[in-house]
Structure formats: structure tokens, C-alpha cells
């Protein structure tokens, strides 16, 4: 799994143009109970730090990589993927990636911890934000992780909701 995650990260880095992208960081409420999940077992705050590359060619797609560390010792993760920014002063940013986590990869239901069913998960996300200056943006975002029942019926998933600040390099 580590080799797969490293290979994907390297491929995204090579696909990124030579121009500088942006760094971002934020704070997220961890394991928010929503209609998409069957969890709500874990708590704490996630500290997220990442990098988003420039657009790929003439597409709106931008590669990203980030890590999220849970302050309560619960599930932390790293993700890579592609996002697209629509709009300028006010924008909408959907993204889709894969994540590797350090939580339980078990296939059985638990009442004390999320059993994700797989070490590698899909990581869709959505952000709505605003440009603060030529270099800075702020956005509210939702990050979901699950395996979409591809690796078994056990798929509680996890939702993290928060805000991040981006700074263009």
C-alpha cells in the first residue's frame, strides 16, 4: 500500500507543470455524523496541510496532495487527487482522490471505532470559497472517505467538515 501511495504521489508530481502552485492548511471537525456515513464514533480536530499544483494544460484540473493529522489520536490520513476550481472571486471546488489512513481496515462492524473495510479509500471533497487577495483564498470544505462498497459491505465512511486557507506561491 505504501508503494502504491508513493507511486501515485510521484506520478502526480511529474504531471504538475514547473510553475508554483499553492499551499493550504485548515482545521476540520473529525467524523461528523451525516447522511452519508454510519459512523460518528471518533472525535477530535484534524489539522490539514497540503499542496495544490497549477492547472494541468488547458483543463481546470489541479493535482493535490495533503495530510490530515487527528489531534485526538484517532484516524489520520494522506490523500492525493485532482480538483477543479470553478469561479474566481467566489468559487466552487470539487475534487476526487484516494487516501491511505491509519485507522481500522477491518471488515466487521464496531461500536467504538470506524471499521473502514480497506486501508485505501476514495476521497471525494467539495469546497466553496472566496478569493481574499491575488494570492490568498479561504474555503469551507467537506472531505469524505469510503471505499464505496467495492471491498465489502462494511463501509461506514467518514466525513470531515472544516475550513482551509490557501496561499499561492
Where are these regions (language model features)?
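Outer-membrane beta-barrel proteins
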Residues: 16, 49-57, 83-88, 132-134, ...
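Cleavable N-terminal export/targeting peptides
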Residues: 1-22
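Residues that define the transmembrane beta-barrel architecture of outer-membrane proteins
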Residues: 41-47, 74-78, 120-124, 157-161
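Repeated loop/turn-to-beta-strand initiation elements of outer-membrane beta-barrel proteins
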Residues: 22-23, 56-61, 90-92, 134-140
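Outer-membrane beta-barrel "beta-signal"
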Residues: 130, 157-169
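Transmembrane beta-strand segments that form the barrel wall of outer-membrane beta-barrel proteins
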Residues: 23-33, 59-71, 144-146
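Outer-membrane beta-barrel architecture
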Residues: 9, 48-50, 81-83, 127, ...
Amino acid at each position: 500500500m505504501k508503494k502504491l501511495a508513493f507511486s501515485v504521489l510521484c506520478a502526480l508530481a511529474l504531471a504538475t507543470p514547473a510553475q508554483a502552485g499553492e499551499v493550504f492548511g485548515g482545521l476540520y471537525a473529525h467524523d461528523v455524523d451525516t447522511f452519508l456515513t454510519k459512523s460518528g464514533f471518533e472525535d477530535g480536530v484534524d489539522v490539514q496541510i497540503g499542496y495544490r499544483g497549477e492547472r494541468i494544460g488547458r483543463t481546470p484540473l489541479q493535482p493535490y496532495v495533503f495530510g490530515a493529522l487527528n489531534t485526538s489520536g484517532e484516524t489520520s490520513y494522506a490523500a492525493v487527487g485532482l480538483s477543479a476550481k470553478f469561479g474566481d472571486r467566489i468559487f466552487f471546488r470539487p475534487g476526487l482522490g484516494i487516501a491511505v489512513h491509519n485507522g481500522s481496515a477491518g471488515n466487521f462492524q464496531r461500536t467504538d471505532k470506524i471499521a473502514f473495510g480497506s486501508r485505501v479509500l476514495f476521497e471525494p471533497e467539495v469546497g466553496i470559497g472566496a478569493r481574499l487577495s491575488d494570492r490568498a483564498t479561504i474555503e469551507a470544505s467537506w472531505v469524505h472517505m469510503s471505499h464505496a462498497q467495492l471491498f465489502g459491505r462494511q463501509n461506514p465512511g467518514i466525513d470531515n467538515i472544516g475550513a482551509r486557507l490557501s496561499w499561492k506561491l
